[in-house]
């Protein structure tokens, strides 16, 4: 990394310019801290001796004369406009012009590459005596004149060339003014850029001093200012245009009482004495940094960017395409579904009602309020994706620029490359999905480039980074560190705010920080003046962002936003940690040098701190408990921060209490130790860094290192010192050896160990290690299950895994795998197959409704339990209900639970399981759900289990245990108010089907008899079992038995089941006046339906009539099958709706044809110009832009210029071919030369190949055509398209051609026609999927 001050050998030249006389008056050259002989040789100027010239050449190089001369870059003022002029008109290749001989002054103040133009103003002040508010700075860059602010008039840039001052013919108070500025003063806006531009490679700037105009005319100006109109002409027509640092009041004071400026406006005119003192101190400190930079970089560079010494904890990557892309973010939002993987989306766009924010989220997530409440500047879509519990945020703007951001744990040690790689992997599938949307997302063609594409620029910003200085300080040393930063504060390099915490030094680094958003001050002011807040008029109506120099309210907000980057330095036991917040990668490299030069100076050089203030890393001793634990956590947080992986885990300080924690050393520390001390160390592993670590146990009472197993959530072994050494052949010896070799102790290790060493069964109530067994609680084993088994059999609970990556409560999953004797992944794969079913929604008593399809549910199961790439946290325990149902379906196994929460044991069983238990064929497993975890119950013999883990987990009707479970289930059976199978006891009738709802409950039976149609027999919602009776998930059938047949069955039923007698209470009649059923009274209160009849059955004559305005079956139909064929009336409405929008569809095809015809022609013209241009020669470039301006507008020229500046000419041509320009939209003008009849014939010729003619319109559903695109490129299923052509009835096409011709020839219709490119019929109509929740907000 290069870190040098180029301004030492190529100094900044500041030339004073007098606009009144249009002449340059004096040049100041900022030499900085050069050697004395160089300074002396410079100051001799015209009297330099050959020796002086030799000194200057040796220091500045062969071109020393040019560096110290008075060249001005650029041509005459007529040739260049601020930010606008793109080429010069002179024919020569050299654009440097020698100025007339003027006085040259030399300043010893240093200029640094990290100086902003705000800093430069202050240094000009101390060198020239011209205070900042009187300076109008301009300079030349890329042959264009530039200034340090932007003046906008009605949103458009105003050309700012002070050299045009004398061309203004209107005068007020003896000063030339631009009167047009005053007439539009309310539309003016000044954007201060001084703080957001570095001097960097600019070596010559010019300053126009306002005093050269004001001082000679002060009396005339004062008189003119007495008239408000003339004052406004002066202020807006001259001061705001060229010296915008002055407010109107400050300008008045400058004219009337200039000596009061320093007192009234200290930010505009700071104390010269104080400023000189501060700048000299700054110069001393920064020069020291540059002097030591290369040495420090060489010392630490090898480790600076490695994963061990750098940790990016948050970052934002900005992807900027080189080509113009128009993306319809509204359509992307509409077409992109919310899923458990991408559960939150937000879009901002301009709808027919104005600025609009729409958010949607999956039902497993919450509304993204944080993002929907943001202030947006341009149409934007935000997508939030979760991977392994981590949120990744993608923000896409309508110009194709997009941003990716996320956060990481410091322990993950992400460097810059891994951050980019991680974010790229996250973004690629989403970008592919959006690109597949075709013209619906990209109405003018193109696609979003991937981060790996060559046609983009990538920048990393908004980073939070931790880096580590590999030395440590004593408490006194850290206090000394803090005190040394005070000089930097006095120099203005940093600022310190608020109270400091013990062991942390917090400050803002200000110097050289410029990558801010200049518009953030506007947003903050809008927020601070928003609804419910008292509005400050001066702030709320901010017209000039230089107001921070003359308005205290704006200054406070400015300092909050642009006050520097937050830096925290942590005093740690093992090193010094530095955190940098919200920085760019460029700023990190810059700040790192400053910070490490400062820190290295603490231990090297003449100014190093005392030895007793340094902690000796190579001679660690057993410290106090807190510091020792902190040292371990600092060096290996992945190992010692147990709650990072499990919030319920016991912390290390409890597992290994003082003074038993060991001392950890790195390999570098071990190398510097004496050989005798190295022999005492035990080699282990650093899990955070992925490198060896070494441990010692210095406390005399606990000299032996041991490794604790089964405590860490990831099965890492935890070092802890013990009194005695583990003996050969013991359990502890086996565990220590396994841990030292493998670094972990897992289930298989435990099985091997148990086989060799375990001889006992655990007591109930303890956490059960994997493959260990524990006794049941005595009230279950000795009371409830008394006499159900014989010795030597015992009841036990078997230990299984309780956690996995992505889900913390995985005990049930592992219990089911153990019960079924399956590998966990094999179980997940099988039940995922079963989940991919059309009836997925019934799983978990309707929990499956959270998903849009069985495939989505199956995919999430595989991601979570097989690939372990996802997480089910937002399901809570719902996933368990789904798994239990899937196991029942796949293996015909049902589970009952004993839930022991805080010692209170309860028996729990689901209604569907009760049905199975009470049926003749049954197979169950018993599971214990305790505070320590979820474990399966088994019957085994202790010796047999220790030998081969053999046990019985599944119980059938032949097992005595089943009798106990069955009796308890009968007691809990409340939901089936009669047994479905008892219907078989009614002669002549059988149950033909069970009707099941979306929550997996049976709600009715279809009873078969000797008639053709089944009897509809409703029951109270009930669980059911899978038996020989078919089940049906469809709607209530329409073809059912008559009232007579239904009543005949009910009569027989009432005789057999008097306790459930069915008594009608009201007759049901539909809107057609047909009698369709009755409502029963009593315990049931159910709706009984029969075939519609016009005659009221005699049995029901005396009952009240209840009219059903809507049949409940129709409601169910609308919910379950929303896209079914609509009613005839709806068909007519949709047909009319379709006809009304056919003209819009035709316009889309028309413009698509025109874009291809005209833009291809223009591109060929540009390509020819490219091939004829030598971009190495200014004359050739000038000719290129001149010819280009003949057929493209200024905005397109800017775009082409930007592409040429950011890439080489050869590649630029490829970029241009993909780009979208304004000339792509200028389509209608060539057609206006036609007559009406000629145009009609021309349009027919253009459009007929795009049309599929037919006689009449078929049924069309409105929801499918809300988003429409050209049929030629559509990737959507659009009913108006067939074979990539637009379907239009023959009798309509001719009419549309005549309407289109009339619209083209009518200039008032141009804007209306071009607006059709949006491609949306109703921009506030969105696709609403079953698992999505959408909310809309207007942003006024």
UniProtKB/Swiss-Prot annotation:
CDD domains: Ubl_ubiquitin_like
Superkingdom, natural source: Viruses
UniProt keyword NADP, yes or no: no
Localization per Swiss-Prot or TrEMBL: Virion
Keyword vocabulary terms for this entry: Transcription, Transcription regulation, Virion
GO cellular component, one term: virion component
Disulphide-bridged cysteine pairs: none
Major location (coarse): virion
Family: Belongs to the asfivirus G1340L family.
Function: Putative initation factor.
Protein's name in the database: Early transcription factor large subunit homolog
Species annotation: African swine fever virus (strain Badajoz 1971 Vero-adapted)
């Amino acid at each position: 990394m290069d870190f040098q001050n180029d301004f030492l050998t190529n100094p900044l030249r500041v030339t004073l310019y007098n606009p009144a006389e249009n002449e340059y008056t004096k040049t100041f050259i900022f030499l900085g801290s050069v050697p004395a002989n160089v300074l002396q040789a410079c100051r001799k100027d015209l009297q330099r001796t050959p020796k002086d010239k030799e000194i200057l050449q040796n220091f500045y190089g062969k071109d020393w004369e040019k560096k110290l001369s008075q060249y001005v870059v650029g041509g005459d003022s007529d040739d260049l406009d601020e930010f606008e002029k793109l080429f010069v008109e002179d024919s020569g290749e050299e654009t440097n012009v020698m100025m007339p001989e003027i006085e040259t002054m030399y300043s010893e103040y240093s200029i640094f590459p990290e100086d902003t133009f705000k800093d430069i103003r202050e240094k000009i002040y101390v060198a020239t005596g011209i205070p900042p508010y009187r300076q109008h700075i301009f300079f030349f860059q890329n042959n264009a004149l530039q200034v340090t602010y932007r003046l906008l008039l009605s949103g458009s840039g105003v050309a700012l060339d002070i050299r045009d001052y004398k061309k203004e013919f209107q005068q007020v108070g003896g000063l030339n003014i631009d009167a047009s500025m005053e007439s539009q003063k309310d539309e003016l806006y000044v954007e201060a850029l001084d703080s957001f531009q570095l001097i960097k490679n600019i070596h010559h700037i010019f300053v126009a001093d306002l005093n050269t105009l004001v001082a000679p005319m002060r009396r005339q100006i004062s008189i003119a200012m007495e008239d408000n109109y003339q004052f406004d002409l002066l202020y807006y027509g001259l001061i705001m245009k060229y010296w915008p640092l002055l407010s109107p009041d400050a300008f008045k004071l400058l004219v009337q009482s200039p000596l009061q400026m320093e007192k009234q406006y200290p930010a505009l005119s700071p104390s010269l004495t104080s400023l000189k003192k501060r700048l000299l101190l700054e110069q001393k400190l920064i020069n020291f940094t540059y002097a030591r930079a290369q040495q420090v970089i060489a010392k630490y560079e090898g480790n600076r960017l490695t994963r061990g010494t750098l940790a990016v904890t948050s970052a934002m990557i900005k992807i900027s395409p080189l080509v113009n892309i128009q993306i319809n973010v509204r359509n992307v939002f509409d077409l992109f579904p919310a899923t458990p993987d991408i559960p939150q989306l937000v879009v901002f766009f301009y709808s027919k009602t104005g600025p609009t924010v729409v958010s949607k989220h999956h039902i497993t997530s919450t509304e993204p309020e944080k993002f929907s409440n943001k202030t947006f500047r341009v149409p934007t879509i935000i997508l939030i994706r979760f991977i392994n519990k981590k949120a990744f945020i993608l923000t896409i703007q309508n110009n194709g620029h997009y941003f990716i951001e996320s956060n990481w744990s410091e322990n993950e040690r992400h460097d810059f490359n891994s951050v980019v790689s991680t974010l790229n992997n996250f973004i690629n599938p989403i970008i592919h999905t959006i690109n597949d949307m075709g013209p619906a997302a990209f109405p003018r063609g193109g696609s979003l480039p991937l981060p790996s594409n060559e046609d983009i620029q990538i920048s990393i910003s908004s980073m939070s980074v931790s880096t580590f200085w590999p030395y440590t300080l004593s408490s006194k040393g850290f206090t000394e560190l803090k005190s040394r930063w005070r000089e930097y504060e006095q120099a203005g390099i940093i600022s310190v705010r608020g109270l400091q915490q013990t062991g942390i030094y917090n400050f803002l680094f200000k110097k050289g920080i410029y990558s801010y958003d200049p518009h953030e001050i506007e947003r903050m002011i809008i927020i601070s003046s928003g609804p419910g807040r008292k509005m400050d008029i001066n702030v709320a109506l901010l017209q000039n962002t230089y107001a921070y120099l003359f308005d205290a309210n704006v200054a406070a907000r400015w300092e909050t936003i642009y006050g520097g980057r937050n830096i925290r330095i942590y005093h740690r036991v093992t090193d010094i940690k530095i955190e940098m917040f919200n920085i760019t990668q460029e700023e990190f490299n810059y700040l790192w040098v400053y910070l490490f030069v400062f820190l290295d100076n603490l231990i090297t050089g003449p100014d190093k701190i005392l030895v007793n203030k340094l902690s000796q890393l190579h001679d660690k001793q057993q410290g106090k408990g807190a510091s020792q634990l902190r040292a371990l956590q600092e060096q290996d947080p992945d190992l010692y921060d147990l709650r990072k992986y499990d919030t319920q885990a016991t912390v290390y300080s409890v597992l290994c209490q003082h003074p038993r924690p060991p001392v950890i050393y790195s390999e570098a520390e071990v190398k510097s130790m004496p050989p005798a001390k190295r022999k005492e160390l035990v080699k282990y592993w650093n899990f955070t860094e992925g490198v060896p670590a070494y441990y010692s146990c210095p406390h005399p009472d606990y000299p032996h290192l041991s490794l604790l197993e089964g405590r860490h959530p990831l099965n890492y072994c935890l070092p802890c010192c013990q009194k005695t050494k583990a003996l050969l052949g013991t359990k502890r010896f086996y565990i220590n050896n396994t841990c030292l070799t493998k670094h972990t102790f897992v289930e298989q290790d435990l099985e091997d160990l148990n086989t060799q060493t375990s001889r006992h069964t655990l007591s109930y109530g303890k956490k059960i290690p994997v493959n260990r067994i524990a006794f049941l609680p005595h009230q279950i084993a000795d009371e409830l299950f008394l006499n159900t088994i014989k010795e030597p059999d015992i009841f036990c609970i078997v230990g299984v895994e309780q956690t996995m990556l992505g889900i913390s409560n995985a005990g049930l999953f592992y219990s089911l795998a153990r019960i079924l004797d399956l590998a966990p992944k094999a179980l997940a794969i099988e039940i995922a197959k079963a989940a991919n079913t059309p009836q997925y929604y019934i799983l978990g008593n309707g929990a499956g409704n959270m998903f849009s399809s069985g495939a989505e549910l199956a995919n999430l199961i595989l991601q979570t339990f097989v690939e372990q790439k996802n997480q089910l946290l937002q399901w809570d325990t719902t996933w368990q209900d789904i798994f239990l149902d899937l196991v029942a379906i796949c293996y015909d196994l049902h589970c009952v639970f004993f839930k022991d929460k805080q010692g209170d044991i309860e028996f729990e069983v689901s209604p569907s399981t009760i049905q199975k238990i009470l049926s003749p064929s049954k197979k169950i497993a018993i599971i214990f759900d305790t505070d320590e975890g979820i474990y399966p119950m088994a019957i085994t013999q202790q010796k047999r289990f220790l030998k081969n883990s053999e046990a019985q987990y599944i119980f059938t009707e032949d097992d005595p245990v089943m009798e106990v479970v069955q009796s308890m289930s009968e007691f809990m059976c409340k939901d089936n108010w009669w047994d479905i199978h008892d219907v078989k006891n009614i002669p002549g009738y059988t149950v033909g089907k069970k009707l099941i709802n979306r929550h997996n409950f049976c709600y009715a039976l279809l009873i078969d008899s000797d008639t053709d149609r089944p009897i509809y027999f409703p029951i109270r919602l009930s669980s059911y079992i899978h038996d020989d009776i078919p089940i049906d998930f469809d709607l209530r059938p329409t073809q059912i038995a008559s009232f007579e047949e239904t009543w005949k069955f009910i009569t027989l039923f009432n005789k057999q089941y008097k306790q459930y007698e069915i008594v009608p209470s009201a007759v049901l009649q539909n809107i057609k006046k047909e009698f369709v059923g009755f409502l029963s009274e009593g315990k049931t209160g159910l709706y009984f339906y029969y075939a519609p009849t016009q005659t009221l059955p005699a049995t029901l004559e005396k009952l009240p009539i209840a009219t059903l305005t809507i049949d409940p079956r129709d409601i169910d139909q609308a919910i379950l099958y929303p896209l079914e064929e609509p009613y005839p009336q709806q068909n007519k409405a949709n047909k009319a709706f379709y006809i009304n929008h056919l003209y819009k569809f035709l316009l889309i095809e028309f413009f698509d044809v025109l874009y291809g015809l005209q833009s291809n022609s223009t591109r060929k013209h540009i390509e020819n110009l490219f091939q004829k241009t030598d971009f190495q020669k200014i004359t050739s470039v000038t000719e290129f832009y001149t010819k280009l301006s003949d057929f493209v507008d200024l905005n397109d020229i800017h775009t082409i210029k930007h592409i040429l500046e950011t890439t080489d000419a050869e590649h630029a041509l490829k970029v241009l071919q993909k780009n979208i320009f304004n000339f792509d939209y200028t389509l209608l003008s060539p057609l206006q030369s036609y007559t009406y009849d000629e145009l009609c014939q021309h349009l027919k010729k253009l459009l007929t190949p795009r049309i599929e003619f037919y006689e009449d319109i078929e049924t069309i559903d409105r929801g499918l055509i809300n988003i429409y695109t050209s049929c030629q490129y559509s990737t959507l299923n659009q009913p108006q398209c067939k074979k990539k052509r637009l379907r239009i009835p023959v009798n309509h096409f001719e009419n549309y051609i005549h309407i289109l011709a009339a619209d083209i020839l009518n200039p008032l219709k141009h804007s209306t026609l071009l607006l059709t490119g949006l491609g949306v019929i109703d921009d506030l109509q969105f696709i609403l999927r079953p698992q999505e929740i959408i909310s809309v907000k207007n942003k006024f």
